[in-house]
């Protein structure tokens, strides 16, 4: 069992397999040029898996594959099969923008993937184009349909932005409602890589939009999930809200993150990280385990953000979320 320095059990590992992405979303990497970390700097699937076996043997029972856009990494289904074959009962999920799902969903399902989290910020082609800086909506919707068709579990993530897609909160939720998909609204996470002019919506503002049409009741958090859940009285539909400016989900945080280059990150909102790359490249499991132990010991008690409006002196993450699957 993995225990951090504050007594929390860590049983969830998020693994980024690439920083590359085929979108240029305004809240993530709008001005990132199409230049990338050289392939030789990335850990191979075998090297990533070497560390992941250590984590699974020590009690990790949930793994999420992220990016960038993980479906851009060649032979991803083979990597997923490696994980599934080693521990068939592991909760194995993937976060994606769904653009490549029409041609990959079946292979992912066959390899052992169980669930997907998919970003869907708009149902209007022109707004989706504005956010992603690419004509994406038609292909994304096809990807969602294909995932459902092959039997993958699907959740939708939406980041409401003032003046851009804030008038679509109900539309996107009802799209999910019609398909029996859970949606989680995510407060925009300030970071130095995003478009400076962006303004996100506070959780209370998001809920007020839902309340314009529906009566909602708070359900609370489910386990260690950062999502606070609500139910709609009129039809029993359940949705979630992820509000990272609060600290109330930090007390039950159960996750660590591994980047494609081998950096082990204790918290998404901290810049500190230690590398396991040298250890796994030489097959030194003991050294990799020692790095893991240090990261767990130093895992922070809570994030550095503050609830409410961003104020002078408040932390703005310099972490590139496309490197860590933010």
UniProtKB/Swiss-Prot annotation:
- Annotated GO biological process: Mo-molybdopterin cofactor biosynthetic process
Give the EC number: 4.1.99.22
- The UniProt record gives the binding positions of [4Fe-4S] cluster 1 as 21, 25, 28
* Binding-site residues, GTP: 14, 64, 95, 155, 255-257
Q: Give the residues the record marks as binding [4Fe-4S] cluster 2.
A: 250, 253, 267
Q: Into which EC class is this enzyme placed?
A: lyase
Q: In which pathway does it act?
A: Cofactor biosynthesis; molybdopterin biosynthesis
Q: What remark does the entry make about the cofactor?
A: Binds 2 [4Fe-4S] clusters. Binds 1 [4Fe-4S] cluster coordinated with 3 cysteines and an exchangeable S-adenosyl-L-methionine and 1 [4Fe-4S] cluster coordinated with 3 cysteines and the GTP-derived substrate.
| HAMAP family named in the record | MoaA_B
The record describes its quaternary structure and partners as:
Monomer and homodimer.
Q: What is the recorded name of this protein?
A: GTP 3',8-cyclase
